[in-house]
Amino acid sequence: FDITQKVGIDLPSESTSRLADRDYKKSWYQQNKDFYCNYKERATKAQQTAFLLQLAAENCVDGDKVRAGDAVNFSIGQGDTVLTPLKLTQMYAAIANGGTIWQMMVAKAIVKTDGTVVKTFTPQKLGTVKTAPSVLSFLRGSLREVVVSGTGAGVFAGFPVEISGKTGTGQVFGRNPNGSLKDDTSWFASYAPSKNPRYAVVMMVGQGGFGASTSGVGVKQIYQTLFGVVGNKVVPGAALFPEGKPPTKLPKISPATKPKEASK
């Protein structure tokens, strides 16, 4: 998925995702070795706990090594691996469409006030997922099962549109200003409909707790709006777009009305 590659969205200040592989571990060690080897002199009083002191001592000696805990974190996307919601959305869209990684875009065109189209923008193909089609097929089946009988089943029970997705609960270390422990980061990543996908929707809520109970509920509400779901039925007239399909054509823009001249 080229995780460290930006999605290329036409908005300023996009953040880069990070993959905590061996190269990252070595780079991180070079940048932080001096701090950990002089931890007692540089850490704040609140950071002088037995656990953090022991961690600093280990990081000073062999912080560039990939330990068993790092490998476990790497396998489930926790630890030092960091993804932006946009990047995860791009990844789920690629899984849904068969493996094509597309540049993400907001703008479709530049249009004058008189309706004249100055320039149109077409998304660019950034690459393809480097895996076998059978692996993508397995992933799609697994993501559907999450919503049918897994951790996403409860929130989408009786939903009339087939959703494929995955709950996520990112563990967080630390305390809030009031002294309470920080809650986990809630995630829900998805695409729909499962068989002929039109949308990829991802939600992340900082300190939101479990993925299904917080982000899953928010994603469900988004799909209700997109597809016009009322109760357990699809009501076409209630959809945000006709038949729940994203628009492909530019909207018609009427020429702007010329302002009246002030009377002399």
List where the protein language model places each region.
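Short amphipathic alpha-helical face segments that pack within enzyme cores
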Residues: 84-90, 214-221
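A short, polar/proline- and glycine-enriched secondary-structure boundary/capping micro-motif
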Residues: 129-132, 211-215
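Beta-lactam-recognizing serine transpeptidase/beta-lactamase-like catalytic domain environment
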Residues: 1-203, 254-264
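Short, gly/Ser/Thr-rich active-site loops of penicillin-recognizing serine hydrolases
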Residues: 116-125, 216-264
